[in-house]
């Protein structure tokens, strides 16, 4: 069997016996200008880069759960029609999450063509509370890869899995097996580590998921004692070059609206906001959830995310 990856990121299998002819096609030249993208394309790319361990369809909606590890992996992605009236859909959503001892969240978006301003209004009218807002930024990938090398004293190690050192810098406590499964999910996942002065304690880390033309950056975190030294840029440049070598040409990331340092860094790299996205908490979810940040553990189950103070974060989700 041959595994073929389409430009959309979808993988298909073709029996070798069905292949008549083939040739090596080089990667398309990397674009230096910013990409064009629809909300739906970006929403689906972002969802593939941070996959839940459990999912179920409700019409065209997707219900996602991952033992409370981040709202993104424990919320409904409501793209399209749920197939039932909205009140019935929301009731089913609350029941589904209650059965898993999780609060019910719906992830929506605003600010671009095809986003969900009407759904946001309908949720608010029914008592759902907008708990967290962040932004999706996009930009051309090549300019990031074109940034100068940082020098021989800044080695970036790329790996397919997050090792103990990477997890030690990742701003979480008690990362569970479920969390590791979510972190490792995606079409082509890379973890970057800049070794620190002490063995086993990285100076900086990052994560990138390559999916067709897109490279998604996340978990870019720097030791606070080493901030303002370009380490975040170093990490992203190394990951961008890896993504370019796999044929990607566009980049995306997610950042909190009040994270001024991250926004300034990404703007210098050529990123710009595409749309905002929000997590709405259902009115019957009385068991948990936290309003402390955009990427916290939710619900009562152990082994999730608790924001600490050991690193400087360059993205929120």
Enumerate the language-model features and the residues they cover.
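Conserved catalytic-core motifs of GNAT/GCN5-like acyltransferases
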Residues: 129-139, 254, 267, 272-285
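Acyl-donor-binding surface of acyltransferase catalytic domains
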Residues: 86-165, 280-281
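Conserved GNAT acetyl-CoA-binding A-motif
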Residues: 100-109, 243-254
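Conserved active-site alpha-helix within GNAT-family acetyltransferase domains
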Residues: 113-128, 233, 257-276
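Flexible, substrate/cofactor-facing loop regions flanked by secondary structure
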Residues: 148-219
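Conserved acetyl-CoA-binding loop-helix of GNAT-fold acetyltransferases
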Residues: 86-94, 219-222, 228-245, 264, ...
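Conserved beta-strand-loop-alpha-helix junction that forms the acyl-donor binding cleft
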Residues: 108-115, 224, 253-263, 280-285
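N-terminal charged segments
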Residues: 3-98, 304, 309, 317
């Amino acid at each position: 069997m041959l595994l073929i990856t389409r430009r959309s990121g979808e993988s298909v299998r073709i029996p070798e016996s069905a292949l008549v002819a083939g040739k090596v096609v080089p990667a398309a030249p990397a674009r230096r200008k910013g990409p064009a993208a629809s909300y739906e394309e970006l929403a689906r790319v972002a969802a593939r880069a941070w996959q839940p361990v459990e999912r179920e369809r409700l019409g065209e909606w997707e219900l996602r759960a991952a033992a409370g590890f981040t709202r993104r992996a424990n919320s409904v992605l409501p793209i399209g029609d749920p197939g039932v009236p909205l009140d019935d859909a929301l009731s089913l959503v609350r029941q589904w999450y209650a059965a898993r001892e999780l609060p019910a969240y719906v992830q929506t978006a605003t600010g671009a063509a095809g986003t969900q301003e009407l759904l946001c209004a309908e949720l608010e009218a029914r008592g759902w509370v907008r708990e967290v807002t962040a932004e999706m930024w996009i930009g051309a990938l090549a300019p990031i890869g074109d940034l100068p090398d940082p020098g021989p004293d800044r080695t970036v190690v790329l790996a397919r899995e997050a090792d103990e050192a990477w997890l030690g810098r990742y701003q979480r406590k008690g990362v569970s097996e479920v969390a590791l499964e979510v972190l490792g999910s995606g079409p082509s996942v890379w973890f970057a580590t800049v070794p620190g002065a002490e063995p086993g304690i990285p100076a900086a880390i990052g994560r990138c998921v390559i999916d067709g033309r897109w490279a998604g950056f996340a978990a870019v975190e720097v030791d606070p004692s080493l901030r303002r030294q370009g380490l975040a840029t170093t990490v992203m440049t190394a990951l961008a070059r890896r993504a370019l070598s796999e044929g990607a040409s566009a980049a995306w990331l997610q950042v909190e609206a009040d994270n001024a340092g991250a926004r300034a860094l990404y703007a210098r790299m050529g990123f710009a906001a595409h749309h905002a996205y929000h997590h709405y908490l259902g009115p019957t979810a009385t068991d948990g959830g936290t309003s402390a940040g955009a990427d916290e553990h939710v619900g009562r189950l152990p082994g999730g995310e608790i924001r600490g103070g050991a690193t400087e974060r360059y993205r929120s989700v």
